[in-house]
Design a protein with these regions (language model features):
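Structured beta-strand-rich core segments of catalytic domains in phosphoester-bond hydrolases
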Residues: 1, 24-28, 36-117
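N-terminal signal-anchor transmembrane helix
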Residues: 1-24, 28
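Generic enzyme active-site microenvironment
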Residues: 5, 39, 164
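Catalytic domains that recognize anionic headgroups
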Residues: 6, 11-13, 37, 67, ...
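Active-site metal-binding loops of divalent metal-dependent hydrolases
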Residues: 8, 43, 112, 166-167
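Short glycine-/acidic-enriched loop or helix-start segments at secondary-structure transitions
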Residues: 15, 47-50, 172-175
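Active-site charged/polar residues at nucleotide-handling catalytic sites that mediate phosphoryl
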Residues: 33
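Metal-dependent phosphoesterases centered on the DNase I-like endonuclease/exonuclease/phosphatase
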Residues: 122-193
Length: 193
């Protein structure tokens, strides 16, 4: 059983990277890795490649109303699904329940708050470095609030779960520590973390 998580950045819809081959490259990687469940953050319906290996999918929000869409593709039938609308944010979470080896399993796809750092943001050369630090502090608070919202959903879940996330933070952060309580980090366990 394999799971893949990937922030596809709208499949380069707005040409942030000067290459028209980005969607095809993403599609090729997905086909080569061939995960059983695929969680995508910053999804774009209009730019997404056809992923014929997956008979089941859940995309949220259903209408792109100021939220960054998430998609979960599955080779297993989806028994249940849900959406976690992070308050005062363009980010959110979603989940699906599937049956694997005759057991119900939940897969979460979370996209936590981004720092939205740009070229002008520098603690060293920016005269407004104090404002930048306040921006960081606000993002840290939002991420922890989003994890609290996720934990409230997970608290009433009776099934084993897998959490895929674009954490928008490091493994040394409070967000990582809060999200990893009583969980195993597959990246670390694989010996690459």
């Amino acid at each position: 059983f394999s799971v893949m998580s990937y922030n596809v950045r709208l499949f380069n819809k707005y040409s942030w990277i000067d290459s028209s081959s980005i969607p095809a490259s993403i599609e090729d990687l997905i086909r080569v890795k061939n995960p059983d469940v695929l969680c995508l953050q910053e999804y774009s319906r209009s730019e997404a490649p056809r992923l014929d290996a997956y008979d089941y999918k859940y995309i949220q929000p259903s209408r792109e109303m100021g939220k960054s869409p998430l998609a979960i593709y599955s080779k297993f039938p989806i028994l249940d699904q849900g959406y976690i609308d992070f308050e005062a944010s363009t980010n959110s979470g979603a989940f699906i329940d599937i049956s694997f080896r005759n057991k119900r399993l939940r897969v979460y796809n979370l996209h936590l708050e981004s720092f939205r750092i740009n070229a002008e943001d520098s603690l060293f050369s920016n005269p407004n470095s104090e404002a930048l630090q306040l921006k960081f502090d606000e993002v840290f608070r939002k991420q922890l609030t989003q994890i609290d919202q996720f934990n409230a959903v997970e608290a009433v879940n009776d099934f084993p779960s897998i959490v895929c996330t674009d954490l928008n933070n490091t493994q040394f952060s409070k967000a990582y520590k809060a999200l990893s309580v009583d969980r195993n980090d597959a990246f670390t366990l694989a010996g690459k973390g």
